[in-house]
Every structure is written in C-alpha cells, then in structure tokens.
A protein has these predicted regions:
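C-terminal capping/lid segments that line or modulate ligand- or cofactor-binding pockets
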Residues: 17-51, 359, 407-408, 420-421, ...
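Structural helix-adjacent loops and short alpha-helical linkers that scaffold large soluble proteins
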Residues: 309-316, 331-334, 366-376, 436-451, ...
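The feature captures the catalytic groove of carbohydrate-active enzymes
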Residues: 344-352, 399-438, 442-447, 455-535, ...
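Acidic/polar, glycine-enriched structural segments that form the non-catalytic walls/loops
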Residues: 1-348, 580-582, 738, 747-750
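Active-site core of glycosidic bond-cleaving carbohydrate-active enzymes
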Residues: 352-381, 447, 509, 523-667
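Helix-terminus loop motifs that line ligand-binding clefts
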Residues: 330-344, 370-430, 436, 443-445, ...
Length: 751
C-alpha cells in the first residue's frame, strides 16, 4: 500500500486552514505549517507559522486575585522567522488563486519520501496559464534544514516569470481570544536584532525580551532556468527579498530551490554561526542526495513500525498518517518533548501535557524505544523544577510535574483543571515502567527512571492521608475528566498513585544491593522507614465502589449530582467548555473524556470484568468525548470487555479525527494524543497486547470486514511482527531472540 495522501483543494478559507496543519513539515526540531507560499487574502483567519521545539518566550499570566503561589507568568512557543513566503508573477500578473481560474489544485503528503507536494495549474485573468509544482521537506538527518523546490512552467505564453522569495524575521504569534485552547495576543515576542545579506546568504537574528533566547535563521537559493535572469537582493525592515526575473517561452520551466536553516541559543552557543555553517554544508551537495537520505530514513522508520490492515485500505492510510505525524513530532534531544499539537500549529501554545506520556509515548516505546527514552529524559531534565513546583504547593517532599509546560514551570492559569490534575505524575510513572518492562533498560532506571518514580511516589504520600477507617485517601485533585474538578478520591488518580508508589518501592527492593541504587537512596535521603510508609499507603489506597450500582464512582461526590441530559443538548453547544461556565459543568454528572474508563485499560486487574462492564456502560451515557483523548480509550476498553462492535465504532470515530476534522479545530494543529491513542486501539485493543512485569501477551480479535492485520514492535531487543487472522495471532521473530508470548497460536523465527 502506498503511503501517499492526496487532497484536491478548493482554495476556500476553511479548507486552506485545515491543510496548513495536515500538510505541515516537521522533524522533531523544526515545524513549518503547510501554508501557501504566495499567501492568502488578508481577511482570512490563517495561522502562518514556523516553530522550533522547546524555544519559547515568557509572558505575563494575569490573575484576577493575587492569591498565594498562583502563577503570574507562562511560557509560549514562538513563531520564528518565515522562510516559506514566495510570490510569483506571470508576465506582470500576480499569481493569486482568488483571481483568474484554478484548473488544478492538489496537495500531496508523500510519507514514503518524507516530503509534501503542491501542484497547481492556474489561468490568470488575462488567460496566461501557469503550472506550479512545489516540493517541501524538513530534513530528519539535518534537523535545522527546511527546503522548498519551487518549479514554475509557462504553459501557453512567452513572457517574463518573476519570483520574489522572502526571509521575514518580523513575525507574530497567532492568537484567538475567544478560544481558551489558543494563546492570547502577546504582540511581537521576538525582537529583530539582525537582518542582512552576507553575499548571497540572507541571515536573520532575533531575541526574546524575557527568556533571552536567541533565534537565528539563514536562507540561500539555487536557480535553474533555460536562459538568463535578472537577480537582485533587497532588504526591508525586518526582512530580506531575493528577486528573480527571467524570460521564458511556452513549455519552459524556471526552478528555484530555497534552503533555510534555523538555530537557537537553547542548544547552540552561537546560533547565527550554526545556522550559516549548517546552510553552507547542506548546499555543498545536491538536493537529490538529501531527498535520497530522507527517503531511506523514513523507510527505516516504517520498517520498524509498519502496520497493515487487509480489508480497508483507506483506514490503513489513516493509520500511516497518524504514525508519520507522531514521527514528525518526536524530540531528537533532551531539550524538548512532544506538544499537544506536535509542531503543526499553535494550539495550546506548544505546551507539553500528560498526553505525551499516556497517549504518545507508548507508540515509540514499542517501535522506536530510543525516541521514547528522549521523552523520559526530558522529564528527568525538569525533575528539579517538579520538586520546586511541589514545594510551591506546600508539599514537604517529592516532585509534582506541571500540568502544562515547556521549561518545567507550570503554565496553567486555571488551577482547578490544571495544577490540581496530580495524575500527570501517574502518567509519567506508568510510562517509565512500560519503557522498562518493554526494553529491559536497567541502566536508565538506575540513572534516571527510579529517581523519578521515588520522587513522584513521595508526593503521593504527602498529598494523601489516612481517613478514620484507616484507608489512604487523596483529596482535592482533578482526574482526566476536566468537567469534574477538585474532588476527593478520583478513582483513576488513586489507581495511578497506588501503582506509582508500589512499583517505586518494588524496584528499590529488587535492586537493594545495587551500588547505584544505594547511592540514589542516599542522595534522596530516603530511609527504609519511608519506603515502608510508601508501600503501606499503596496497599491501603481507597478505591471508590458503589454497592448499589455495582460501579466505581469517578470520585466520592460524583454520584450525588444530577445527570446531564446529553440527548437534549443542541449540537451547536458542543464542546460544552465553550458554552457553559465551569461551575455549571462541575455540578453535573457529565464527562469530557474517559476517566474511570481509562483506569480499566491501565489497571485492568483492579476490578472484576463485571464491575468494569457496568461502569463502562454507565460512563458511556454521560461522556461527551469533547476531548480528542476519549474515544480511543473507549475503544480499547470495549475490546478488553469483549464488546467488539463498539470497539470498532469508537475506533472509527478516532482514526480520522484530523483527516476529516471532526472536532473542527485541526486547523490549530493535529491531535497527537488521539493519534497515539488510535495506535493503541489496534495494538492494545484489537490485538490485546499487554506488556508488564510478568512478560508479554496478546488476546486478539478480528474487526468485521477486515481479513487480517499486522504490526511490528520491538521487545527486549527483538523485532517482532504480529499477524492477526480470524484463526488467531502469529508472532514472527525478525531480529533477536524469540520471547515467550502468551496468547499466540504460532511462533515463527524468520532470522
């Protein structure tokens, strides 16, 4: 199956905005929105953007009342220099898709090559026809490099072709004051310090005012044309201009290759020098070689993560799209992680949430554990900040990771649905353990992983207490469901806390004679008495259960509230968060997303199948799925409970969320968590893959209409391919040793 997605574009505002996100280019370091090079009408609400992962400015966070330790500042991802703008004229007429006639207009995402393409045939108002072919790439091998190959052909006229290629340093972030999921208008966050030509290379250097981060970019061009051209180098305030004018005959083509490099002071001592040197090095070769290496890199990615669905090619394409977008978003160094929108847009201001560990990291743990390790190393890098965050909230010991952040400091201005969501600690702890169980990487655990487990475990011990019945309880926290905040004993949170605490102690006990472990306990000043207290709290954790309904209440007060009538709620009032005051939502039984249901995926041994099924059916009736993190979880748990038809239906709701723009906000950036959740819906849901301390197992079923499906994972150094047919699962060992996999009908060794 070809991994290529083609869209025929009408060039309407809503569709263009969507395609800016879907056809973005990224490599984990830089991300460039799939904007139309020539621009769009000024009155269109478009988000033109280029981003560097982990690069930010600090801006004020206004609080209505200055209460103790509420945050007063936050970080926001920067929109950096625009190097994608190119304007075109055909014999004096400006190329403008809102004028003349569009004869052909398509966008292509070629996941096999690691590029995007744009193909347009346009007739000017006077009838001159132009064929425009554009190829764009962010290099995986040269992370700071972005290229545009801009080919213009005159189809039915002899005349002049003019190209104006811009390097614009004077840029602003996008804002929308009516949507809390986007940033507010903070004005220009970058102060332009340098814009200049150094021979034929354009260089721009900007600096933030508060974080004092320097961002540099360099641009240069190569030109291919049939004859001679007039070339000039211009400079305006905050930008440079490369101008080409060439005479062509009908059928002749002019080709411009635009090379851009980016750098920042988070990573480099001299960003300008790095950008210039990297650009020179990239241009010493030819673009064809860079394309070739890009293709090989992407081929290796799919070779290790390949997933095939026999029986639904369109669905298979959507799966490939999701995996590729995650790959584009993945960090390649310790300075950053994966934002809620990846690098495809400014939704949620480029912040990292619990989504990264709970929904996205599992994909990389199974297919590219080195990238998964980078995600966890980022969390280790901000562990001291998490300790400071815990202290700000009054905790004597331990670490509390911020709800949303870039640098490690809390960026959530609304603490009831932000900072109070202590379960982010549980997500990070769970992912550390999944990484360890899957890879067996004991060195990571001893050097970084166990320290995070112990510090998050300490936090739970401090935030909780024993009630009069001797149960360990956790009060005033918020679970995954953001329509229910500041509650006592959120079932999901308590499960996370118990697991975090018990596994932190278990690892310490199992490696008690290890020198590094002893040094760690000494460094953290953790005594055997404290370890015993942590273990006991985990064992005595209170998990709410309602005898009358036979379900796990989401929290202690949830079942006391009236039930929200979702059927009577008009469609235009969803998502509820944009139409109802938070307090109004908090007073009802209504869920934004999977909460207790998510716990049944992660901690399925805590309850009987009967309790989980009753709870699932109860919460299903009151969950809006306003969050993109929801339907994939309902699919996974439905698979676990044997409700296969329902599992497939929820998966169908999840898999094309971005491609079909079902939440109407993909224009702000793709939903990386949902993409990871879709992967889990197949691997952990349909195939029933489980990896834990005891080993690896599957419990598969075949969705109706599918003939078979397969996927590859890495487990303990081995590359395995699972193929599920109607008769069961086959495991093939492609590299390494054959593990003991429970639940398969056959093991094959293809080495």
């Amino acid at each position: 199956m070809k991994r290529i997605i083609t869209r025929h574009e009408k060039f309407e505002e809503k569709e263009v905005n969507l395609h800016e996100a879907l056809f973005s280019n990224a490599n984990g370091y830089i991300g460039i929105r799939g904007n139309v090079e020539e621009g769009v009408p000024e009155d269109w609400n478009t988000m033109r953007g280029t981003y560097i992962n982990g690069v930010y400015e600090i801006i004020p966070m206004k609080q209505a009342e200055s209460l103790c330790n509420l945050i007063e500042k936050k970080q926001t991802m920067l929109n950096v220099a625009d190097t994608q703008t190119i304007c075109l004229k055909a014999d004096g007429e400006r190329f403008d898709l809102t004028k003349g006639n569009i004869l052909e207009n398509e966008r292509i995402l070629d996941m096999e090559q690691g590029i995007t393409k744009r193909h347009v045939i346009w007739a000017s108002p006077s009838g001159k026809e132009i064929e425009l072919s554009v190829t764009r790439m962010t290099s995986f091998l040269i992370p700071s490099l972005f290229t545009i190959e801009y080919n213009v052909k005159a189809l039915n006229f002899d005349g002049d072709i003019e190209i104006e290629s811009y390097h614009i340093a004077d840029v602003k972030n996008y804002s929308n004051p009516d949507d809390p999921r986007l940033g507010d208008d903070s004005g220009a966050l970058l102060k332009v310090e340098v814009v200049k030509w150094r021979e034929d290379m354009s260089v721009a250097v900007s600096k933030t005012s508060v974080s004092e981060i320097v961002v540099a970019s360099a641009v240069s061009h190569r030109l291919r044309l049939p004859g001679k051209a007039e070339i000039s180098y211009g400079k305006e305030e905050g930008r440079t201009l490369y101008h080409v004018k060439a005479g062509v005959k009908a059928g002749e083509e002019l080709s411009l290759i635009k090379y851009s490099t980016f750098s920042d002071s988070v990573r480099e001592e001299d960003p300008e020098e790095f950008a210039r040197t990297t650009l020179k090095d990239a241009m010493r070769g030819n673009l064809a070689d860079i394309y070739k290496k890009q293709k090989e890199y992407v081929e290796e990615f799919f070779a290790n993560s390949e997933m095939e669905i026999d029986g639904d090619e369109e669905l298979g394409q959507a799966v490939n799209f999701n995996m590729y977008e995650l790959f584009q978003s993945a960090p390649r160094d310790k300075y950053c992680s994966i934002a809620a929108k990846g690098l495809s847009g400014e939704g949620y201001e480029g912040h990292y949430f619990w989504d990264t560990e709970m929904y996205v990291a599992p994909f990389f743990i199974l297919t590219n554990p080195e990238l998964a390790k980078k995600i966890l190393q980022y969390r280790y890098g901000i562990l001291d900040k998490a300790r400071e965050n815990a202290a700000l909230l009054g905790h004597k010991k331990g670490a509390l990771y911020p709800w949303r952040t870039i640098t490690g400091e809390e960026c959530s201005g609304y603490f009831p649905s932000g900072t109070a969501a202590y379960h982010i600690n549980g997500a990070i702890a769970y992912t550390i353990l999944q990484y360890f169980f899957t890879t067996g990487d004991k060195d990571f655990m001893l050097e970084q992983g166990e320290e995070m487990l112990l510090e998050t475990a300490r936090l739970w011990l401090d935030v909780g207490n024993y009630d009069r019945k001797g149960r360990f309880v956790i009060n005033e926290v918020t679970g995954p469901d953001e329509y229910t905040c500041m509650t006592d004993n959120n079932y999901y949170t308590n499960c996370c806390a118990a697991y975090n605490m018990s596994m932190a102690v278990a690892f310490a006990e199992e490696h008690s004679s290890n020198k590094k472990l002893k040094e760690l306990l000494k460094k953290l000043e953790i005594t055997s008495k404290e370890l015993k207290e942590i273990k006991e709290a985990a064992e005595k954790m209170y998990l709410p259960y309602d005898e009358e309904l036979g379900i796990n209440p989401q929290d202690d007060s949830f079942l006391q509230k009236p039930v929200w009538d979702l059927k009577a709620t008009p469609k235009e009032e969803f998502p509820l968060l944009l139409h109802y005051h938070p307090l109004h939502l908090y007073r009802y039984q209504v869920c934004k997303q999977a909460d207790t249901v998510l716990s049944y995926f992660l901690f399925e041994d805590k309850q009987s199948k009967e309790v989980m099924k009753k709870s699932y059916e109860y919460y299903e009736k009151i969950t809006t799925h306003d969050s993109s993190l929801s339907t994939c979880v309902f699919s996974i748990v439905a698979s676990r409970l044997g409700m296969h038809k329902k599992a497939v239906e929820y998966f169908g709701d999840s898999i094309k969320l971005d491609l079909l723009n079902t939440h109407n906000n993909t224009k702000d950036g793709v939903h990386t968590a949902n993409m990871g959740g879709c992967y889990m819906a197949i691997v952990n849901g349909f195939a029933g893959l489980r990896i834990n301390k005891e080993g690896i197992s599957v419990d598969p079923f075949m969705p109706e209409g599918w003939k078979k499906y397969s996927f590859k994972i890495k487990y303990r150094g081995s590359l395995l391919k699972f193929t599920v047919t109607k008769s069961g699962a086959i495991c093939e060992v492609l590299k390494g040793e054959a593990p003991d996999v429970k639940g398969i009908k056959e093991m094959r060794n293809e080495k």
